[in-house]
């Protein structure tokens, strides 16, 4: 499809830009297969799932997500390494869900059999879909970096973010300090990526914010579908506060660093400077 489109549009500036844009969109859609499928199921079951079904809606979503995951592995749409990342996200995400629902940060209002405490198990797949997207987008766009911070600093930073998600309920919230560290660590980092014919680059911090924005949009779809709700949405649905974006940006850091545990960030050739992501630094 793309080669034919590229021939039709030609190699001029406009034709090249349109081809790159189309290729970018198709690759992004491919990277979002798991998350997009799960989100579509959440939205669809809100309106068509029978109230008197033997299997509850949440349990259906859990079994559906498992089936989709197995199909993606069987058809090699997802690699074993990406499956490892998804498993890590399940553990990290479910642990946070158990704590946050107990603290009343948000609520899953429906019944289910497959659950831990107040948390239906399909929720782990929502976190896993972020991990799946990041792992897949890194692979199909051939991500590489310049001025990437030492790996050990990113591990400590993501740990501090994760701890703060719990600790701010009991002690002072250090979120402002974490954002300062975000720009200190990643402010000079560029991510390089291939779309179709050309190599492009973007500030990595901008990438974090853009992905967080789309997660916020997906969160609005999820709450609209009553898969969960925040306290101010108990009576009727409303847009999720834009203030949640800062939490999603920080969660993006954790997600991104978890992916680097399996797929080590590579250095973009020809960018100069020392590869600061080398082991042992």
Question: What is the predicted role of each segment?
Answer:
Residues 1-281:
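Aromatic-rich, lipid-facing transmembrane alpha helices and their immediate juxtamembrane interface loops
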């Amino acid at each position: 499809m793309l080669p034919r489109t590229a021939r039709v549009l030609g190699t001029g500036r406009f034709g090249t830009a349109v081809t790159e844009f189309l290729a970018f969109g198709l690759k992004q859609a491919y990277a979002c297969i798991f998350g997009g499928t799960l989100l579509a199921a959440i939205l669809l079951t809100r309106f068509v799932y029978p109230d008197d079904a033997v299997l509850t809606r949440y349990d259906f979503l859990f079994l559906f997500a498992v089936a989709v995951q197995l199909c993606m592995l069987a058809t090699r749409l997802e690699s074993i390494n990406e499956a490892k990342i998804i498993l890590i996200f399940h553990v990290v995400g479910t642990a946070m869900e158990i704590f946050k629902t107990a603290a009343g940060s948000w609520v899953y209002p429906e019944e289910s059999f497959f659950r831990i405490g107040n948390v239906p198990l399909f929720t782990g797949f929502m976190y896993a879909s972020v991990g799946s997207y990041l792992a897949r987008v890194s692979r199909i766009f051939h991500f590489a970096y310049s001025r990437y911070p030492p790996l050990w600093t990113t591990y400590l930073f993501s740990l501090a973010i994760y701890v703060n998600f719990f600790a701010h309920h009991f002690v002072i919230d250090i979120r402002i300090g974490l954002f300062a560290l975000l720009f200190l660590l990643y402010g000079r980092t560029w991510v390089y990526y291939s779309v179709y014919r050309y190599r492009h680059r973007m500030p990595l911090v901008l990438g974090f914010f853009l992905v967080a924005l789309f997660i916020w949009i997906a969160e609005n779809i999820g709450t609209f579908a009553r898969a969960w709700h925040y306290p101010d949405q108990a009576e009727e649905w409303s847009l999720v506060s834009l203030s949640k974006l800062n939490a999603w940006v920080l969660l993006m850091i954790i997600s991104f660093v978890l992916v680097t545990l399996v797929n080590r960030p590579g250095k973009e050739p020809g960018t100069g400077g020392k590869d600061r992501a080398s082991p042992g630094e």
